[in-house]
A protein has these predicted regions:
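Polar helix-capping/helix-linker motif
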Residues: 1, 14-15, 52, 203-206
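Active-site-adjacent "subsite" loops/lids of carbohydrate-active enzymes
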Residues: 1-33, 59-80, 92
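Generic detector of bulky aromatic hydrophobic side chains
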Residues: 3, 8-10, 33, 42-44, ...
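Short acidic catalytic loops
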Residues: 22, 29-47, 193
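Hydrophobic targeting/anchoring helices
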Residues: 36-41, 69-81, 86-208
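Short, solvent-exposed beta-strand-terminating loops
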Residues: 41-65
Length: 208
């Protein structure tokens, strides 16, 4: 962050992590297990503003300034724009790298080119995908479906089969809730998935 604290969960878009680790690992998976596609989570929706020295160098090249702009400053929107452009560069880089060796591999980045990233598709992805919030899922699906059905790409949405409420564990949704969520997606022509958490042994409760 701006104070120099690092994030233990988020990789910098300006680092060599994709080239050094992620892309080789994805190629290994494709080569070793003959998978037909990859779906990467926590991509555009997990991206953070970067205040590292590599980001500073990129910002200087982008804007000519040595200093990061303050939130609310006139240049702050340009600072965010730089990160958006960098994310798309990163997305195209890993997709193109995989296709260079596995041209038939279907690549998908969760929530890319949806309302979370409302841009024309500029990466060689196979489809558009997202998993919407466990709360108010029907309303979220209604908004997202109207956008996705106009992209010209195959798309799918996944709803959670349970709610998570502060102070209590996961609460399984009713059949009626899940049917409503699925109906909204399917009536707009999208693919539908439902997300449950099986046990480590793969057991799925009978009620599911």
């Amino acid at each position: 962050d701006r104070e120099g604290r690092t994030d233990g969960k988020t990789a910098s878009l300006f680092s060599d992590y994709p080239e050094k680790y992620m892309i080789p690992q994805l190629k290994e998976v494709a080569r070793k297990y003959d998978v037909n596609g990859v779906w990467l989570d926590a991509e555009c929706w997990g991206a953070q503003l970067d205040y590292s020295e590599k980001a500073r160098a990129a910002w200087k090249e982008f804007s000519g300034s040595d200093e990061f702009p303050e939130d609310g400053a006139a240049e702050f929107e340009e600072f965010k724009c730089m990160h958006r452009l960098r994310f798309e560069e990163y997305l195209r880089a890993w997709v193109d790298a995989l296709h260079s060796e596995f041209p038939q591999l279907d690549c998908c980045s969760n929530w890319a080119y949806t309302t979370m990233m409302p841009l024309p598709v500029r990466a060689e992805i196979a489809n558009i995908s997202g998993d919407f919030d466990p709360f108010l899922s029907v309303d979220r699906a209604r908004t997202e479906c109207r956008y996705l059905e106009n992209t010209g790409y195959p798309w799918e949405l996944q709803s959670w089969g349970f709610d998570i409420v502060d102070g209590q564990g996961p609460c399984r949704k009713t059949v009626a809730q899940i049917c409503q969520e699925a109906a909204v997606v399917m009536m707009h022509g999208g693919g539908y998935m439902n997300y449950f958490l099986p046990t480590r042994g793969g057991y799925i409760p009978e009620s599911v």
